Amino acid sequence: MAHPHLLAERISRLSSALEKGLYERSHAIRLCLLAALSGESVFLLGPPGIAKSLIARRLKFAFQRARAFEYLMTRFSTPEEVFGPLSIQALKDEGRYERLTTGYLPEAEIVFLDEIWKAGPAILNTLLTAINERHFRNGAFEEKIPMRLLVAASNELPEADSSLEALYDRMLIRLWLDKVQDKANFRSMLISQQDESDNPVPASLQVSDEEYQQWQKDIGAISLPDPVFELIFTLRQQLDNLPNAPYVSDRRWKKAIRLLQASAFFSGRDAVAPIDLILLKDCLWYDAQSLNLMQQQLEILMTGHAWQQQAMLTRLGGIVQRRLQLQQQQSDKTAFTVIKEGGMFSRRPHYTLPPEASASTLTLLLQKPLKLHDMEVIHITFDRSALELWLTKGGEIRGKLNGIGFAQTLNMEVDNAQHLVVRDISLQGTRLALPGTAEDSMPAEIKQQLETLENDWRQQHTRFSEQQHCLFIHSDWLGRIEASLQDVGEQIRQAKQC
């Protein structure tokens, strides 16, 4: 088997070749290629004339010697037009009921059925068996069919509670397509002279029969790690609890997981990663309402849980709360405390300085820096006599901010715990402390917890960076996930700086 990274590069180049000349259909081509490489079915929903049939025809060129069959269903379509006519010779000579299948669906690797919901019951029943079991009953014999990809298309969804639901459930990937939107792409499409029947894929990129068969075994060997399973189960529970969520059968979940395994395999990985789960948005919807719902639920999962974003924010909230508790305890211990004086009948309490504040000039540290008089202040120098007078009689108090310049007026008070508190213009306050008693505002316990959390964040970001090279995921999703991780990282960095 080729080296995983070489295989991923080859599949990427194969997809690029298939996409040539198709405008705004890259994502559809890539998912149809993934379906073809893993033996699944695709439903394309969209108005006529938007290259649905061309997508299916292109996929034939992904394989060496692949045969294609396409048919436009009508209400009058017969099984003979899809599965082949009856052999008159066999019926006449041997009395055998046998179809001549050469050139029809039973012998094609790539099948495209347009206006699929117009098919009658006889076609639908045979088609269900072909999709489920990859077998076709031809008279008295069961014949194995080589179908690797079935692309069904329509401009409408099947009616609810109709006989078509069983077939619709077999369409694992469901893509809602629209007209070309971008102006430049529309112009390029109009003037393109490319022959749609030309093979755009170099022979060196085409998949051989042996490779295809081996890859089916290799896909099954891709592991589903426990954390990824937990994300899938969380999504399943969310859908079960939402009133308007689509019903998703166990069979559909199982087939979807195999698609995720294929995504991991063709991305060069040996295990399903959270990034692969984005593919579920194209597997689990039923109609327009459930399509939007799936987008919302996958976005919540990818930007909140897949790389532990919400869990890390919850941990950060707990660390910040603990830091506030420790800082409050430390603040009570180190704050500069004055002595309350005065009798019980005094109109106003007055205070005196403690014995350790005996110098003629006192420098007190702010336990938290404040912006005072347009200056970032970390300590204030007071004249001892002026401070004593203010403690005794009140009035105006001045101090030199950071010990420089002229003394500036201060908004200062004594709190209930007899600590000096200075406030800024927005009335945010901090206690004052003597030099040598104010300790680091960030306790060692908190520093360690923040370091551990930041390391965990780096690991998650590295995991995402290693996993994001997935051909089958649109780049818009990668941008949203990256933004969610960067937001968590920024909040951690801000907490470390406080």
UniProtKB/Swiss-Prot annotation:
Disulfide bonds: none annotated. It is found in: Cytoplasm. One of its GO terms (cellular component) is cytoplasm. ADP binds at residues 23, 49-54, 196. Its EC number is 3.6.1.-. This is Regulatory ATPase RavA. Homohexamer. Interacts with ViaA. Component of the RavA-ViaA chaperone complex, which may act on the membrane to optimize the function of some of the respiratory chains. RavA functions as an ATPase. Its main location: cytoplasm. SUPFAM superfamilies: P-loop containing nucleoside triphosphate hydrolases. SMART domains: AAA. Belongs to the RavA family. InterPro entries: AAA+_ATPase, ATPase_RavA, ATPase_RavA_C, MoxR, P-loop_NTPase, RavA-like_AAA_lid, RavA_ATPases, RavA_LARA_dom. Keywords: ATP-binding, Chaperone, Cytoplasm, Hydrolase, Nucleotide-binding. The gene is ravA. It holds the Pfam family ATPase_RavA_C. It catalyses: ATP + H2O = ADP + phosphate + H(+). ATPase activity is stimulated by ViaA. CDD domains: AAA. One of its GO terms (molecular function) is ATP binding. Gene3D superfamilies: 1.20.58.1510, 2.40.128.430, P-loop containing nucleotide triphosphate hydrolases. The lineage of its organism: Bacteria, Pseudomonadati, Pseudomonadota, Gammaproteobacteria, Enterobacterales. It comes from the Bacteria.
